[in-house]
């Protein structure tokens, strides 16, 4: 009985023992990340690397407004469709925005040669100077420049024509051979446009040009072509059976372009001295213009983000994150978020780092919880926390810096005859996009795995640091906790935390406590052995008495015969 009381007293006394636990921070975060081995791991802190939002507007880029073509196409704008007159004064822009199906393109039907290439060239132009290459009133004294209008290019209810081209017709019943040249003295590339008229019948050809065998010749250092009108009846388009084919060339600085014709020339009126700029482009978008500034524009809307990746749209203009097909790219910076079930004993003991983290420790990632006669409390290990924060911050910044190559990515232009090339280009682009997406996702998975392992290692190192200081002055009780064999006041606890614990100072007290506990264990062990022997003997006696009683009863009623032979 005395031994039992000692055991109970020992257990009750142990409850009052001073303890220190090593643990880590937890909070109410619901952020989840993926690693190589796990999905949807809840963590205390993380950073998002993927931008998935936009404002739905067309915005200025670096303070410069875009050229919004509205109901006009690039062709209608550059040729001077009279319905696009509001655009003629625009000479600089950050990018060009065209709607998917603009109404005002080539008002007089015909073929626009190398149109996709022209769009590609204009996509790298951020401004131009629109100037008269051949002034209307003085360049063509032997030809009429006012009668070349058509109802298909009407403006305000009246027949009109392109504002950058002149339709030259006969004058006084004659169409003399013409020869006109221009020397590029702009010190920039000059875009020159012209056209060739193809009447629907010979009557129109004679009436307009007074010749049946017309030609148009255009020559420069890098361009040389002779055109012959094709007179034929064609299906009506915009109420026209005739056609005008449109052509263009880029004239280098100092180069000369020469026009010769005896009919059917749609002559240049205005040309454009081009200024190319990095980051410009042409996008197709239904978004409306907004009062906003941005660094990155997509057809869906503007993106204001410094993140390295985005999944808004593959076509971008400006300083834009790289497009990937991922739906989630989140990099962990904190720890696994597993708040402990804070079941508290008589003195508020809580679980250590094995069972979960501490929501009560808010000033660090790793730290301690102690309890003694003076009370209990949390304390972060500032040094290990700061080292971890610095290391992870540097890693995240390095990843973002390496992957954050911001650039413009505009779509390539192909005509209807280049569908196979376009399909091949799409497959190549899709392949690159898949590689980028895979690389981005793999990078995040690997870094998340390393970061969580890094945190686990830091907690373990902190535990080993305490264990190496305490040695046999305390015992491990699991869950990251140690129970002291001696009294450990707040000053003692602080010395453990900062690594200055004086082991010899407490070793004698700890030794006596250990011997006392070991003695109680031995005494209680002897009592339990006596009780076990007593129980075994008593059970055997009861069994023998029972067997004797049964045998006597069976002999008395004749069920069992007993013979004793001498």
Curated annotation (Swiss-Prot):
Residues 551-566 are cytoplasmic. Pfam families: Hemagglutinin (PF00509). The keyword Glycoprotein applies. It is found in: Virion membrane; Host apical cell membrane. Palmitoylated. In natural infection, inactive HA is matured into HA1 and HA2 outside the cell by one or more trypsin-like, arginine-specific endoprotease secreted by the bronchial epithelial cells. One identified protease that may be involved in this process is secreted in lungs by club cells. Its main location: virion. Residues 1-17 form the signal peptide. GO terms for molecular function: host cell surface receptor binding. Keywords: Clathrin- and caveolin-independent endocytosis of virus by host, Clathrin-mediated endocytosis of virus by host, Disulfide bond, Fusion of virus membrane with host endosomal membrane, Fusion of virus membrane with host membrane, Glycoprotein, Hemagglutinin, Host cell membrane, Host membrane, Host-virus interaction, Lipoprotein, Membrane, Palmitate, Signal, Transmembrane, Transmembrane helix, Viral attachment to host cell, Viral envelope protein, Viral penetration into host cytoplasm, Virion, Virus endocytosis by host, Virus entry into host cell. One of its GO terms (biological process) is clathrin-dependent endocytosis of virus by host cell. The record marks 344-345 as: Cleavage. It is a single-pass type I membrane protein. Residues 18-529 are extracellular. Glycans are attached at residues 27-28, 40, 71, 104, 142, 177, 286, 304, 498. SUPFAM superfamilies: Influenza hemagglutinin (stalk), Viral protein domain. Disulfide bonds join 21-481, 59-292, 72-84, 107-153, 296-320, 488-492. Major glycoprotein, comprises over 80% of the envelope proteins present in virus particle. Homotrimer of disulfide-linked HA1-HA2. Interacts with human CACNA1C. Binds to sialic acid-containing receptors on the cell surface, bringing about the attachment of the virus particle to the cell. This attachment induces virion internalization either through clathrin-dependent endocytosis or through clathrin- and caveolin-independent pathway. Plays a major role in the determination of host range restriction and virulence. Class I viral fusion protein. Responsible for penetration of the virus into the cell cytoplasm by mediating the fusion of the membrane of the endocytosed virus particle with the endosomal membrane. Belongs to the influenza viruses hemagglutinin family. This is Hemagglutinin. It comes from Influenza A virus (strain A/USA:Memphis/10/1996 H1N1).
């Amino acid at each position: 009985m005395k031994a039992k009381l000692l055991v109970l007293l020992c257990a009750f006394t142990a409850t009052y023992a001073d303890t220190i636990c090593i643990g880590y921070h937890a909070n109410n975060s619901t952020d989840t990340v993926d690693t190589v081995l796990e999905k949807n791991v809840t963590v205390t802190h993380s950073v998002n690397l993927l931008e998935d939002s936009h404002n739905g507007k067309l915005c200025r880029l670096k303070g410069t407004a875009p050229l919004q073509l509205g109901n006009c196409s690039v062709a209608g704008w550059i040729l001077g469709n009279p319905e696009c007159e509001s655009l003629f004064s625009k000479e600089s822009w950050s990018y060009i925005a065209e709607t998917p199906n603009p109404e005002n393109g080539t008002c007089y039907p015909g073929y626009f040669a190398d149109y996709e290439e022209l769009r590609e060239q204009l996509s790298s132009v951020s401004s131009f100077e629109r100037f008269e290459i051949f002034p209307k009133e003085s360049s063509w004294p032997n030809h009429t420049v006012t009668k070349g209008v058509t109802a298909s290019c009407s403006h305000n209810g009246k027949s009109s024509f392109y504002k950058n081209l002149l339709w030259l017709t006969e004058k006084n019943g004659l169409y003399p051979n013409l020869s006109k040249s221009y020397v590029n003295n702009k010190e920039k590339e000059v875009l020159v446009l012209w056209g060739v008229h193809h009447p629907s019948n010979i009557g129109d050809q004679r009436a307009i040009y007074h010749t049946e065998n017309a030609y148009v010749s255009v020559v420069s250092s890098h361009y040389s072509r002779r055109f012959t009108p094709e007179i034929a009846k064609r299906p009506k388009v915009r109420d026209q059976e005739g056609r005008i084919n449109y052509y263009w060339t880029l004239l280098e600085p100092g180069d000369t372009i020469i026009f010769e014709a005896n009919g059917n020339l749609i002559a240049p009126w205005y040309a454009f001295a081009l200024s190319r700029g990095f980051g410009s482009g042409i996008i197709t978008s239904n978004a409306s213009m907004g009062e906003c500034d941005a660094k990155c524009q997509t057809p869906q809307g503007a993106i204001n983000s410094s993140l390295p990746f985005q999944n808004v749209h593959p076509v971008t203009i400006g300083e834009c994150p790289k497009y990937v097909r991922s739906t989630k790219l989140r990099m962990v910076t904190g720890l696994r978020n597993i708040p402990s079930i804070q079941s508290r004993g008589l003195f508020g003991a809580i679980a250590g780092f094995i069972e979960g983290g501490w929501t009560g420790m808010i000033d660090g990632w790793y730290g301690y919880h102690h309890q003694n006669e003076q009370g209990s409390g949390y304390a972060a290990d500032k040094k290990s926390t700061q080292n971890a924060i610095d290391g992870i911050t540097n890693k995240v910044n390095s990843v973002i810096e390496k992957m954050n190559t911001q650039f413009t990515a505009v779509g390539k232009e192909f005509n209807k005859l280049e569908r196979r090339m376009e399909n091949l280009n799409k497959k190549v682009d899709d392949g690159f996009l898949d590689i980028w997406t895979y690389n981005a996702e793999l990078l995040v998975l690997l870094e998340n795995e390393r970061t969580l392992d890094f945190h686990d290692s830091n907690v373990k190192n902190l535990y080993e640091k305490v264990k190496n200081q305490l040695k046999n002055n305390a015992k491990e009780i699991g869950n990251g906790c140690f129970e002291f064999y001696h009294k450990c006041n707040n000053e003692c606890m602080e010395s453990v935390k900062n690594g200055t614990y004086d082991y010899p100072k407490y070793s004698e007290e700890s030794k006596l406590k250990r011997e006392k506990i070991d003695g109680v264990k031995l005494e209680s062990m002897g009592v339990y052995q006596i009780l076990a022997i007593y129980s075994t003997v008593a059970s055997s006696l009861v069994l023998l008495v029972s067997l004797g009683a049964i045998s006597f009863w069976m002999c008395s009623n004749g069920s069992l015969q007993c013979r004793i032979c001498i």
